[in-house]
C-alpha cells in the first residue's frame, strides 16, 4: 500500500508565487489525512551526493529536485508532486497499487511534463 505522504521539493529560497499557492490549496481540499512534506535545504543534506552538491551550487533547482524526489520516494514511499500540480479528486482509490504515474491533462497542457510519482 502506498503511504499517505505527499512529498515536494522547494529549494533556492524563493517565495512561492500565487499560482503555486493556489495549486497546493487543492492538495488539502482533496487529500485529507495526507502528510505533506516539503524537502528543502533544512531537511535534506545537499552535500550528501556530488551531483546534488554541484547542481545546487550552479542553482540548477530542477536537477536538485530530480535527485531529491527519487531519493525520498525510494526511502520513505508516498507520492511526489511538483508544486504546480492541481488535484481534482482523492488519490485514495490508487493507494492499494504498488505504484502509479499521473500526467498532464491535454486540456491544461503548458508544454511541460507534470511529474507525479507514487511508490511503496
Provide a role label for each language-model segment:
Residues 1-49:
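N-terminal anchoring/stem segment of glycosyltransferases
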Residues 7-10, 34, 39, 56, ...:
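Aromatic side chains
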Residues 9-12, 103-104, 120:
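Structured loops at beta-to-helix junctions and adjacent beta-edge loops in soluble globular domains
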Residues 13-20, 57-66, 112:
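Aromatic-acidic/polar surface patches that form glycan- and anion
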Residues 35, 46-63, 94:
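An acidic/histidine-cluster motif and surrounding catalytic segment
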Residues 41-43, 117-120:
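Short hydrophobic/aromatic-rich motifs at helix boundaries and adjacent loops
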Residues 62-112, 117:
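GT-A fold catalytic core of metal-dependent nucleotide-sugar glycosyltransferases
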Amino acid at each position: 500500500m502506498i503511504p499517505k505522504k505527499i512529498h515536494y521539493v522547494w529549494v533556492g529560497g524563493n517565495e512561492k508565487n500565487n499560482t503555486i499557492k493556489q495549486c497546493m490549496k487543492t492538495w488539502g481540499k482533496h487529500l485529507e489525512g495526507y502528510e505533506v512534506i516539503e524537502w528543502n535545504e533544512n531537511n535534506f543534506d545537499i552535500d550528501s551526493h556530488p551531483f546534488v552538491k554541484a547542481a545546487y551550487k550552479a542553482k540548477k533547482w530542477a536537477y536538485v529536485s530530480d535527485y531529491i524526489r527519487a531519493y525520498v520516494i525510494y526511502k520513505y514511499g508516498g507520492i511526489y508532486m511538483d508544486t504546480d500540480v492541481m488535484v481534482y479528486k482523492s488519490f485514495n482509490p490508487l493507494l492499494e497499487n504498488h505504484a502509479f504515474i499521473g500526467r498532464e491533462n491535454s486540456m491544461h497542457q503548458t508544454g511541460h511534463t507534470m511529474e507525479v510519482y507514487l511508490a511503496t
